[in-house]
Amino acid sequence: MNGTRLAVAATIVLWLTTPSHAQDAGSRAAGVAPQPPKSLKVAAVQFRSCRDLDKNVAGITSQIRRLAKEGVRVAVFPECALTGYFEDVVKTTTAEQLADAERRVANACREVGIYAVVGTPYRDGGKLYNSAAVIDPSGRVIERYHKIQLAESWPTPGDHLSVLRVDGVPCSVIICHDERYPELVRLPVLAGARVIFYLSHESGIRQESKLGPYRAQIQARAVENTVYVVHANAPANDDLSGSHGQSRVIAPDGNIFGEVSMFGEEVVTADLDLRRATAVNALNSLAQGPLTDWWKEGVKRVRIVEVGSPAPVESRR
């Protein structure tokens, strides 16, 4: 193993052995060395958004509360779940309306003590982003990822990749068209990520030529990096419009071990055995070949989200 691989491996070990807030505090109080989690229970929520922001919030928060009772630690919702993937609605929803809706979702996470990854437009300084808000069990937005590779004309492209902790597990986020770009997963994995949350509102089932590539691409991202992918997609509508569902959880060997239908508002849950997410295929690209230095420079551009650094989300209606 060369020096570059050692450096990245050290980063990954740090992320896998650094626990979440409660684990860390409890371990210090007991005088016991913290242990990394061995599993993570996740849910990919195939949520059907409508044009009514309040109804979407009600549906999302209802799922969060229900899934918490089932022991789920992180609930993942589709791209633009908060508003629906409707360009006119996205463009006319104000920053204040989005912030209020997000606060209500954050309240639900805080009340039941789980994480949520929610697709939402986000306005900042006159710019409009296609984003994912990662909310922790205290109701804090610990990361806000903006879609980088765009299929739409309305958003501003994002400018960063990130690695964040969910119950101490290093994770990253991509959105829909991002899946076509292998580096958007490979770089966060080299920076420590073991689970990728993938939010989408993919092409409708009438666009048959795209369905096979959609499946192949995201499975490739899992196996070529030896990590889990938790994919929340919007369902197809009865008139065959909208997306095409099939939300799924993909194992580090690329096989799908949980998937739902094309049309239903359904949820796929899974207990991820984190020992399987070794990132070995990603790390091999640092061990040999002409791109070692290139990957090393790319890893430096990944934002590492430190526990406790984000500002809290206001938790009142």
What are these regions (language model features)?
Residues 20-24:
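Boundary at the C-terminal end of the N-terminal hydrophobic targeting segment
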Residues 35-50:
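Short beta-strand segments enriched in small/hydrophobic residues
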Residues 163, 233-317:
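C-terminal beta-strand edge segments of enzyme domains
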